[in-house]
Amino acid sequence: MACGQRGGSWRPSGWFNAGWSTYRSISLFFALVTSVNSIDVFQLVNPAFPGTVICDERGITVEFPSSPGTKKWHASVVDPLGLNVPNCTYILNPEKFTLRVTYENCTRRVHGGYQMTIRVMNDSAALRHGAVMYQFFCPAMQVEETQGLSASTICKKDFMSFSLPRVFSGLADDNKVTKLKMGWSIEVGDGARVKTLTLPEAMKEGFSLLIDNHRMIFHVPFNATGVTHYVQGNSHLYMVSLKLTFISPGQKVIFSSQAICAPDPVNCNATHMTLTIPEFPGKLKSVSFENQNIDVSQLHDNGIDLEATNGTKLHFSKTLLKTKLSEKCLLHQFYLASLRLTFLLQSETVSMVIYPECVCESPVSIVTGELCTQDGFMDFEVYSYQTQPALDLDTLRVGNSSCQPVFKAQSQGLVRFHIPLNGCGTRYKFEDDKVIYENEIHALWTDLPPSKISRDSEFRMTVKCSYSRNDMLLNINVESLTPPVASVKLGPFTLILQSYPDNSYQQPYGENEYPLVRFLRQPIYMEVRVINRDDPNIKLVLDDCWATSTMDPDSFPQWNIVVDGCAYELDNYQTTFHPVGSSVTHPDHYQRFDMKAFAFVSEAHVLSSLVYFHCSALICNRLSPDSPLCSVTCPVSSRHRRATEATEAEKMTVSLPGPILLLSDDSSFRGVGSSDLKASGSSGENSRSETGEEVGSRDVMDTKGHRTAGDVGSKAVAAVAALAGVVATLGFICYLYKKRTVSNH
């Protein structure tokens, strides 16, 4: 038996909008167990609600406990003061012991969700007591309601992700007892294929869960457990059903979601962009882009053609697409900023978001081995009629150079080029057993005036030729050529030595930030690099790096950091070299390493805390190393070290822009700001109290290069500690005196 009850005209502010988003991909329900706040207006008998509250997108269901003694009871929706809520419609089912209400008119909108209060009257003889009021909270069920987050599946290259609203607190609770009762579990798949995993097990399977203040982001890799893969030709679609359960004391949260993703690139021709989706159980409902939501029945009228045989194909007219400049495209690249596809899947609405763009390469590419001549040139011809509209041959340019064609016949619409492989901006690269040379030709269309030269109005043509390794041996006598002198001798090369905050080497310290402050054993990240050169054939090789107590790199004492391109073997904390990745244009132009901050010690005396760093380096020919240091292998033997010694004319020396202030681990400056530390360091005051090798001290080199004992001893430690104690005592006495003086007045 079910009865409906309706009130008068009370309607609180800020109510939930009943028009749920048609692009929902996440369905959630939230079960609160035995932890609902209760307020007994007349008699506080049962402070915790013994039943279950289920929150879903349509409303709230309250399930009361059923027992043989519960025969007569009544429940109603009231406001926080216990008064009946007018205009509230709810369904009370005494047989199933349930109360069902809608969010509209029966709840109060609060931050993050909805609040509802009910009053329960139990008139049974066994459980006779007065009315008890219970207050419930239901979270906002859709991500769109909170912080403007997207509820659709976001397709990436190797995984799909979707956002869930963060509808509870306590994930980071430090209470150990609470943590033992909390935990995640994940159900993957549906039907008989459901697999339940704990969160650590799911992480091992490749899943990941990211949580911030407003949302939870769940990542599902395409090869994870439970992901269904649909394939049709070269098109792929991935689908997964998930149920995430979070259990905490008195509370159970369940998120249910179906996610789909079609990550394949689109195909483009002269007029359309085509998106292909394999056949799967879902049925397309609508397409959304550029703030337009187009129903499937209206696609053709909006420039989109649909093929629904053997999967789904959507043909977008290029008039609907945006354009952007691209290095790989002739003029522009066509794309959509985002495209949302909404499907009806197993009676649920599921959406995915993709970012389609037309893939394009250089439109004209001449690739043939015959273009490369045996004497090291590339020969090719360009005709004006190669394109429509025709090319203006007078505007032809070769790369970024001023090289001109060797022959031009305007009547025939022909120009002929004879380009040296080592000039005119020609580039080369190695692939397997071939060396490939490449250049690019620029030209304007004949219907554009010469003043309109710009990247988006240019025609570009790539010309390539290659030599095989055997061809190089047969046709070119490489051994007879002397190596380029400028690659190892003094020339227009400039080096720079810089320090970085960490091993990401993103942004170096500026000159105005010196002196830098470091504590003992704290790493100092260094980088030596070549500047103002883009020659890919040169390679920077470190010779030596050392530290001094003055800015003069030739001053003594010195301490070695790098010797003959290798870490100093006698160092307690050896230098670590870092590889240079492909994020920079010429990785061979860089050398990166770090060393641990140390105390400067000489003859049992602590030297100045300001330390200056210097490096010497060589520039080598990468293709033909002409110095033993250019191909050094660490560690270096003493015999090889003598053989690899470079002349002073070959080496270049660089220094850091400023010194580094070194402090001991227990220095009283640890809590002081960086600017105060720099001021202290630049004044020459030494605040270290530990200089033994076990805390980061290092021996220095005398003028003959011999090691000097590096133990400061207990006297230096005691002196510094005593001085610090005296200063602290005097400061405390002054403080007491001032305080007493103020109180007397």
Curated annotation (Swiss-Prot):
Domain of life: Eukaryota
Signal peptide bounds: 1-38
Gene Ontology MF terms in the entry: acrosin binding; structural constituent of egg coat
Transmembrane segments: 717-736
Classification via SMART domains: ZP
Pfam families listed in its UniProt record: Ig_ZP2, Ig_ZP2_3rd, Ig_ZP2_N, Zona_pellucida, ZP-N
Assembly, per entry: Can form homopolymers that assemble into long fibers (in vitro). Polymers of ZP2 and ZP3 organized into long filaments cross-linked by ZP1 homodimers. Interacts with ZP3.
Domain notes: The ZP domain is involved in the polymerization of the ZP proteins to form the zona pellucida.
UniProt name for this protein: Zona pellucida sperm-binding protein 2
Residue span of region Disordered: 469-491, 673-709
Glycosylation sites: N105, N122, N310, T462
